[in-house]
Amino acid sequence: MNIFRLFGKQRTAPAARERLQLLLAHERSSVGSDLVFLLREEILAVIEKHVQLDRDKVQVKMDCNEHVSTLEIDVEIPLNATVRAA
């Protein structure tokens, strides 16, 4: 007779799954800040090829949840912006 059976069957899979989800969420959030910075710089470089803009008036935000990540970009382009040929 196994003594561990007296205490009931342990259900470690749900706990392990939850710990893994927390770990992945933490890794995604730490990588997310670097990713947002890189995306911001690349997006600004592309926009600046066509239009002159103030880099301080650009905001990039990344939101992550368990199913999807969204990237929100807010670029203020002045009405009198100089348009450049590509």
UniProtKB/Swiss-Prot annotation:
Keywords: Cell cycle, Cell division. The keyword Cell cycle applies. GO terms for biological process: cell division; regulation of division septum assembly. Gene3D superfamilies: Cell division topological specificity factor MinE. SUPFAM superfamilies: Cell division protein MinE topological specificity domain (SSF55229). Belongs to the MinE family. HAMAP family: MinE (MF_00262). NCBIfam families: minE, PRK00296.1. This is Cell division topological specificity factor. The gene is minE.
